[in-house]
Structures are given as structure tokens and as C-alpha cells.
Amino acid sequence: MAIPITVLDCDLLLYGRGHRTLDRFKLDDVTDEYLMSMYGFPRQFIYYLVELLGASLSRPTQRSRAISPETQILAALGFYTSGSFQTRMGDAIGISQASMSRCVANVTEALVERASQFIHFPADEASVQALKDEFYGLAGIPGVIGVVDCMHVAIKAPNAEDLSYVNRKGLHSLNCLMVCDIRGALMTVETSWPGSLQDCVVLQQSSLSSQFEAGMHKESWLLGDSSFFLRTWLMTPLHIPETPAEYRYNMAHSATHSVIEKTFRTLCSRFRCLDGSKGALQYSPEKSSHIILACCVLHNISLEHGMDVWSSPVTGPVEQPPEEEYEHMESLDLEADRIRQELMLTHFS
């Protein structure tokens, strides 16, 4: 069971009742446009988060000097969507940057605790078949239940000796493995992998790979790009297509794989703390991975609430940490080769 967390208003403790306190900020006192511009989400969505997370962010008995769950959530949303602890953000809700930092930490942990509630593969056969039908309707590849890829998020250097987080571009990052459906909803998110690991290694060592290898998603497969090895459950593009069927397969694969590329762009445009435009995440790898996961939870909740996340406006340049450059991964799995050949002959000849 989650342990309730209370954040004290340090500004009130320092300055007393004469200082602007959190009780004076009310959602009903500001416009919808203000909430969207400052915190990136509409009023009803914020109210839902207060209901969802309130018990984890406050004690059972109210204390006048505790920062309310509502204000903690606004502070966290402000950081996630802007990427910085701006003075104006804290001033808007009446707290210091130090208090904002504690609010972000608490809201992040509350969201991470609920990750499995919002990020998962469908459990029933009807939903799985609906996934396959949707992907088939997109580009004609049957049996697909998700698209997989990795996204790097820049973090500060943990320490001078630890090179495991240094990627091929010489930047410190986390390599985050994700799977999404055709709407961009995330079904798997693993955010703690060091940036030095190649995508294929991350997938090989992931719980996602263990699930498919154990046969948990029978008669289904994922689509991944050429940074991954071909598997019986993971279809990749051909390195050098030669026949018309192979060209058509690669084109269909590219069209389908673009769903997760679009999802990554959406995550980074909505949650600017991930895109590097305000610098790397200034936290330990563990805390950074939790922030990334919290943003992914919010992304999925947005979709559940009918928000059109793909049309969200980009307020500035989206600067993803440089992507890794990989050579094409040749298949070592003869059965996977056979399945892909049969797929091309049956559906793309």
C-alpha cells in the first residue's frame, strides 16, 4: 500500500501568514487557457489526477502547513511540461523552487506506483485481436500487436568513473525501451537501461523479451527496426530488399513502425523535461528513470481521457539526444527467417 506523503510549505514556515500561501491558489480562479499554457493539461484532467493521487500526496488529517495535493500536482506538471524549475512557475502557485522539487519527487513516485494500472498489454483475446486488426488496416501486416523501439533521454553524469551511461555520441543518457499500439498508447515502458547499451542488448535483457520468449503472446509479434535482431516474435525490415514482395514488405513495415516514432516525438513535445531543450535531467539515473516513466503514465492517461495528444502544439524545438547509429542486425534465427519469408509470400507477393 502506498504511504501517504505530506510536503510542508517551507515558505509558510519561513515567512508566516504574511507570505502568499498555497490555499490562495484555486483552479477555479484561473482560466482554461492559463492552465494549458502553464501546466499543459485541461482543468478536468487535473481534477482527475487530484482524485487519483490525492491519497498518496496527503495525510488522512489535514494540516494547515502542508502543500495540498492539487498544488503538488500543478508543480509537477509544470516541470514535466516545461523542463525547468522556473521562478515564475513557483510564484504562480506560491511556492519556492525547493518546494517545487519536493513536489515533483512525490508526484513522480505516486505516478510510478500506478504505472502497471495504465501501461500494459491487453489481457483479453478480443482486445488483442482488435490490436491486430488495427495494425493490419494500417499497412497490411498481420499479427502485429505493437511496435517497439528505444529512445534516449539525456541525464547528468552520475559520476566521473561510471561510463555505462555514456552513449555513442559521448552524452550521458538512459536508453528507454517502449512498445506502443496504433494510437500511440504505451504497452511496455522500461526506462532504467544505461545509455551505453545498444538497442538490441536492451531488448535481449528486457522483461519484454522474456515475456515473448516464454510464449505469453502466442501467434502475435512486434515490429522493430533494423537495430534489433529478427525473432519469431519480432519482425524487422530486410537490409537489402530484392524482390517486389520484399520492397512492399519493407514499405509496409516502415509505415507501421512510424507509429512509435510519432509517439516519441509526441512525448518529447508534450513533456519538455525529456527532450533536452532545457538541458539533461539533473537527477540520478534512478530518479531520472522514474520521471520518464511518470511522463509515460500521464501520456496514457491523456489518451484514456480522449485527449488528442498527437495534435498537441510544439512550443519550441524538440531536441532529442542524438540517436545511436547501428549497423543492420543480421538474423541468427532460421525459424524467424522462415516466418518472415512466409509472411512476405502470403501477404506481399
UniProtKB/Swiss-Prot annotation:
Transmembrane segments: none annotated. Its EC number is 3.1.-.-. One of its GO terms (molecular function) is nuclease activity. Keywords: Cytoplasm, Hydrolase, Metal-binding, Nuclease, Nucleus. InterPro entries: HARBI1-like, HARBI1_animal, HARBI1_dom. Pfam families: DDE_Tnp_4 (PF13359). Detected in brain. Residues 148-300 form the DDE Tnp4 domain. A divalent metal cation binds at residues 149, 199, 225, 261. The keyword Flavoprotein does not apply. One of its GO terms (cellular component) is nucleus. Its cofactor is a divalent metal cation. It comes from the Eukaryota. It is found in: Nucleus; Cytoplasm. Belongs to the HARBI1 family. PANTHER family: NUCLEASE HARBI1-RELATED, PTHR22930. Interacts with NAIF1. Transposase-derived protein that may have nuclease activity (Potential). Does not have transposase activity. This is Putative nuclease HARBI1. The lineage of its organism: Eukaryota, Metazoa, Chordata, Craniata, Vertebrata. The gene is HARBI1.
